Amino acid sequence: MERAIQGNDAREQAYGERWNGGPGGSTSPFQLPDESPSWTEWRLHNDETNSNQDNPLGFKESWGFGKVVFKRYLRYERTETSLHRVLGSWTGDSVNYAASRFLGFDQIGCTYSIRFRGVSVTISGGSRTLQHLSEMAIRSKQELLQLTPVKVESNVSRGRPEGVETFKEESE
């Protein structure tokens, strides 16, 4: 018979999952294990001097409930199959269940964060708005992961504001 994990036991289990990257436990909102690259693998795919040359293997995301934070690094190959897999890394139900282990009668802060290709999005709110927060988080995650490098790099980042056209001078 599975026992309910409450109080300090839940925090200790969450702390262990945060660092050991184990698959989603009874308190974790994540349903996939951590897939962090090794140091050597990370260095092969990331340029420390020029972030524009980065070729990340995946993305980082986290859920926080008060002082408890769950983090994951998930691999993402920018394919349709990979997108569907990582979009299922957590669900509204798994987030609600994990949050219920840490939420008492008082409202606490809840935060979702995702970082991919140098872009970071953080959404936060109170525990009473958790359902709305998880809906916003899944939309943000889907939009961020579906952006192509062309969309991320706008005309402004290339030094030419949008709407400005270049004209050749006619010589007489």
UniProtKB/Swiss-Prot annotation:
Alphabetical list of Pfam families matching this protein: Tombus_P19
Upper classification of the organism: Viruses, Riboviria, Orthornavirae, Kitrinoviricota, Tolucaviricetes
Keywords: Host-virus interaction, Inhibition of host innate immune response by virus, RNA-binding, Suppressor of RNA silencing, Viral immunoevasion
Name of the featured protein: RNA silencing suppressor p19
Keyword Ubl conjugation: no
UniProt biased composition (Basic and acidic residues): 1-15
UniProt record similarity statement: Belongs to the tombusvirus protein p19 family.
The keyword RNA-binding appears for this protein: yes
GO biological process: symbiont-mediated suppression of host innate immune response
Entry's Gene Ontology molecular function annotations: RNA binding
Subunit structure: Homodimer.
Source organism: Tomato bushy stunt virus (strain A23) (TBSV)
